């Protein structure tokens, strides 16, 4: 077995030799085999001439065993081994040669031998062997060079181990006494940033500064890129200002990196300032930099400034591309200037399909479906451009927006017939459209058609169906869709659970809704404020305030903030339970928590105070409401009028009625019916009739409740045949 292995060694050397001429070239070095020519001196060996040397090398490269190889040479030098290892030998062969030569008496491996062998090992990912060789080098007293470690770092990068470079750089200094320079730091930083180890890169940079190693322009560029990648743009900008302290001047690449990140984070003004600085520093931005700024301006509807930036592009010799025009057109469409976008479109020499799609989508978004179809027709007939899935999706969306889901479905079938495969979004629009129209069966058919087309429905599509089923109280079917989602490779999200929980609460299945909340948490889906508000409302409707409070506590514990809806539900529940003082305390807490109360919040509390007989407090609260900047509406006055009349203060109720008229708030049916009811109950039927006449003159239209109030007061209850009256009157 040993002889066979050795034969394979020599055979590998022979097979991988590129040519006999190269062999002869290395054979010419065999003069160093003699004692006088070798690096190591030592032993007497017969002098070998050119022809004999060639023969010796031929013997070496033949499939001899290792014993024959030993007999062919008196001694091999590190330089000869270095040249041998440079040949394309495999790792095992190279290691065996390395071990064999190292066993020669008086032989000592050189740095070059180690470097070429470590290079081969690194290319093959043999990093444990590399670590052993580095220790061996240290034990042999070989002086390390930085280039060796940089080479290993590159190999770690290629193997996908960027983090190992920091370990190696620490060992350079602490283990192998090789002090890293800016070269090593730059390589490590570059590898870390390309490997998305941005935080580690920042730490390495600060370590570099603490060791007084001067950073280069390349160093700053890489570290700024790392900061921008994790949205620490302020740190990157701080580095920009520190560059001059280290004798570095920012170049175009650094400015472009920062401008891109600022624009991406919607810090457009700073991006503009940096662009101006870039011009002053003599750096030339590229087209992408201009496009970044133009996009940022368009995001904030600063279209005129974006157009001026295009002019600056032209002055600088950059021709706006489809991306530039696309950003501008999209910005114009966003602010409703679709016709201006159309005018810009006709200035583009050869518009690509993305430009057409931008304009079509702009028309569709603003309800101009016919204009969108005209652009599509022009695109096909005049420019010969075939519509893509984005084009068709815009049309489908346009028909969906108009409620013409049937026509949208026809567009989908048409695109498929023309060889354009619909995507998930195409089908999801239709599913949502049919669900909104209450055509759930059609929506389900579209979902099945989508699956037949080889596409997996997404969470949005399933959510549309579940929500639609729940709204129609078809809970079992909604649950079935919910169970189908994992089988289709689709994970339910918070909206899925919220729809089901809301549906269960609507049919008073709160127990099952709570189970679903527990399942939701165990599945790793975080319940939000909407989830808890739905359940809290359900308990409060049933008068179970204690259970509602438990959920509020859980809500706070889980980190979901109480919003105005939560507070309103609780205040309303407390008022219904007659705990008005607690409701008012909760209202004050809402104010302390920074929630500005809306009219809804105020009206709930006013209504609660009035129903509890605390009319004066309600009137005072209405005045406080005005002082806080809220404007009382008709609901506010209706609650106060009802409260005053309930307290026997009908005159005050009528005064409040005149007040709301004076403030320009038109009374509604509830206002008239409330006053007429209390007037009739107090025996003031004639006044109620006068109030009705006054209301009719002002445009009030009585309803069944209005006539019922009057009839019950005029005609005795036992003699009133309501059915016959309504049949005769209506």
Swiss-Prot record:
Segments annotated as PPR repeats: 110-144, 145-175, 181-215, 216-250, 251-285, 286-320, 321-351, 352-387, 388-422, 423-457, 458-492, 493-527, 528-562, 563-597, 598-632, 633-667, 668-702
Keywords of the record: Mitochondrion, Repeat, Transit peptide
Transmembrane segments: none
An example Gene Ontology biological process: mitochondrial translation
Targeting signal (transit peptide) range: 1-18
A Pfam entry, by short name: PPR_1
Compartments where found: Mitochondrion
GO (cellular component) term, any one: mitochondrion
Keyword Protease: no
Protein family: Belongs to the PPR family. P subfamily.
NCBIfam families: PPR (TIGR00756)
Stated name of the protein: Pentatricopeptide repeat-containing protein At5g64320, mitochondrial
């Amino acid at each position: 077995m040993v002889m066979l292995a050795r034969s394979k060694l020599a055979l590998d050397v022979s097979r991988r030799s590129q040519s006999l001429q190269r062999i002869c070239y290395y054979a010419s070095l065999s003069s160093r085999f003699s004692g006088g020519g070798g690096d190591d001196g030592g032993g007497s060996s017969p002098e070998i001439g050119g022809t004999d040397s060639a023969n010796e090398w031929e013997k070496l490269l033949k499939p001899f065993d290792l014993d024959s190889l030993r007999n062919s040479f008196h001694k091999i030098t590190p330089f000869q081994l270095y040249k041998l290892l440079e040949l394309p030998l495999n790792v095992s062969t190279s290691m065996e040669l390395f071990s064999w030569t190292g066993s020669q008496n008086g032989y000592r491996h050189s740095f070059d031998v180690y470097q070429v062998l470590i290079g081969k090992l690194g290319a093959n990912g043999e990093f444990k062997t590399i670590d052993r060789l580095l220790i061996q080098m240290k034990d042999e007293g070989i002086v390390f060079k930085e280039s060796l470690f940089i080479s290993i770092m590159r190999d770690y990068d290629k193997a996908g181990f960027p983090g190992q470079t920091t370990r190696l750089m620490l060992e350079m200094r602490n283990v192998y006494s090789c002090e890293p320079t800016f070269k090593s730091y730059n390589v490590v930083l570059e590898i870390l940033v390309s490997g998305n180890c941005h935080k580690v890169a920042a730490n390495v940079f600060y370590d570099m500064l603490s060791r007084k190693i001067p950073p280069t322009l390349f160093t700053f560029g890489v570290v700024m890129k790392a900061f921008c990648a994790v949205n620490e743009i302020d740190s990157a900008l701080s580095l920009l200002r520190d560059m001059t302290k280290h004798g570095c001047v920012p170049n175009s690449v650094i400015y472009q990196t920062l401008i891109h990140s600022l624009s991406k984070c919607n810090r457009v003004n700073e991006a503009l300032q940096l662009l101006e600085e870039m011009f002053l520093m003599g750096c030339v931005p590229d087209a992408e930099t201009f496009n970044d700024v133009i996009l940022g301006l368009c995001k904030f509807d600063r279209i005129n400034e974006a157009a001026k930036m295009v002019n600056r592009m032209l002055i600088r010799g950059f021709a706006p591309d489809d991306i530039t025009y696309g950003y501008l057109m999209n910005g114009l469409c966003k602010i409703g200037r679709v016709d201006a976008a159309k005018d810009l479109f006709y200035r583009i020499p050869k518009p690509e399909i993305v430009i057409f799609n931008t304009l079509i989508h702009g028309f569709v978004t603003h309800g101009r479906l016919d204009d969108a179809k005209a652009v599509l027709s022009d695109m096909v007939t005049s420019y010969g451009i075939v519509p893509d899935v984005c084009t068709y999706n815009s049309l489908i969306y346009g028909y969906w927006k108009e409620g013409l889901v049937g026509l949208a479905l026809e567009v989908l079938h048409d695109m498929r017939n023309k060889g354009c495969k619909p995507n998930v979004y195409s089908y999801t629009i239709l599913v949502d459209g049919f669900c909104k129209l209450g055509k759930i069966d059609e929506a389900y058919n579209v979902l099945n058609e989508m699956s037949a087309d080889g596409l997996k429905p997404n969470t949005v599509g399933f959510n549309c169906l579940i929500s639609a089923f729940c709204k129609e109280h078809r809970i079992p079917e909604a649950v079935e869709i919910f169970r189908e989602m994992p089988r289709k490779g689709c994970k339910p999200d918070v909206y899925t659970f919220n729809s089901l929980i809301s549906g269960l609460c609507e049919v008073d299945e709160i127990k099952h809704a709570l189970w679903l909340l527990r399942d939701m948490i165990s599945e790793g889906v975080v319940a939000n404020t909407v989830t808890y508000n739905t359940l809290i409302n359900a308990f409060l409707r049933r008068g179970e305030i204690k259970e509602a409070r438990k959920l509020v506590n859980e809500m706070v514990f889980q980190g979901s903030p109480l919003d105005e809806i939560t507070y309103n539900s609780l205040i309303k529940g407390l008022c219904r339970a007659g705990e008005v003082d607690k409701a008012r305390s909760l209202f004050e807490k809402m104010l302390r928590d920074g929630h500005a109360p809306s009219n809804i919040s105020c009206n709930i509390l006013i209504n609660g105070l009035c129903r509890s007989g605390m009319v004066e407090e309600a009137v005072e609260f209405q005045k406080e409401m005005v002082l806080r900047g809220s404007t009382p509406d008709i609901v506010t006055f209706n609650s106060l009028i009802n409260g005053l009349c309930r307290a026997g203060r009908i005159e005050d109720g009528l005064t409040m009625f005149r007040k709301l008229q004076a403030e320009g708030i038109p009374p509604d049916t509830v206002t008239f019916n409330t006053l007429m009811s209390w007037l009739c109950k107090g025996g003031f039927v004639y006044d109620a009739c006068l109030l009705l006449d006054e209301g009719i003159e002002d445009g009030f239209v009585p309803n069944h409740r209005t006539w019922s109030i009057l009839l019950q007061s005029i005609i005795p209850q036992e003699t009133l045949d309501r059915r016959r009256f309504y049949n005769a009157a209506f």
